[in-house]
Design a protein with these regions (language model features):
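Single-stranded RNA-binding regions, centering on S1/OB-family and related RNA-binding modules
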Residues: 1-179
């Protein structure tokens, strides 16, 4: 006697953010935009697709609260982090504090709060097109700049001049981005 074998279709893995991004119908979403807004969204899309840096000015630093699962207490806990806000034209780009600094080189929250008005490079890491905002990473853009700087001999020899951007000024020190 043969026993029937049930064949179940394998469950499809959930789609990644990148896969969901490529499924968006941009023509429908961008239909009512002005030319300036369309240009801004196109530069955001290009940064997300190609991991290329775009430049923007920090216009503010806001605290954002989210609930995260703590495995030790087995409860949801409210966690608040500061996020830099960049608005090139109308689209809000949020940069969490965790995406501002390299691991091991984190700065206190007051340094981020003193960066308002600073011009920074960032890479878009998530696009929330329906909600009208994007999430960026200064950390990834800085990593790309460091790679470029390290592989150009004329930029890091004694006596060479480099471009710098003033990021933050405090009572005893300042933070400068050289590239």
């Amino acid at each position: 006697l043969e026993t029937p074998v049930s064949v179940e279709a394998p469950k499809a893995a959930p789609k990644s953010d990148r896969q969901l991004f490529y499924e968006l119908k941009f023509n429908n979403l961008d239909r009512g935009l002005t030319p300036e807004e369309r240009q801004e969204w196109n530069s955001i899309y290009a940064s997300y697709r190609g991991r290329s840096a775009i430049t923007g000015t920090i216009i503010g630093v806001d605290p954002h609260s989210i609930y995260v699962w703590n495995p030790e207490t087995e409860r949801r806990e409210k966690k608040t982090m500061y996020c830099a806000i960049v608005v090139p034209y109308r689209v809000r780009i949020v940069i969490p504090a965790s995406e501002m600094w390299e691991a091991g080189n984190e700065r206190p929250d007051y340094v981020l709060q003193n960066m308002v008005g600073a011009s920074i490079d960032l890479v878009i890491i998530k696009v929330e097109r329906e909600a009208g905002f994007a999430i960026g990473s200064r950390r990834l853009a800085s990593r790309s700049q460091r790679y470029f700087f390290a592989h150009r001999e004329d930029l890091h020899r004694i006596g060479s001049r480099v471009k710098c951007r003033m990021l933050a000024v405090g009572p005893r020190r300042c933070l400068v981005d050289c590239y």
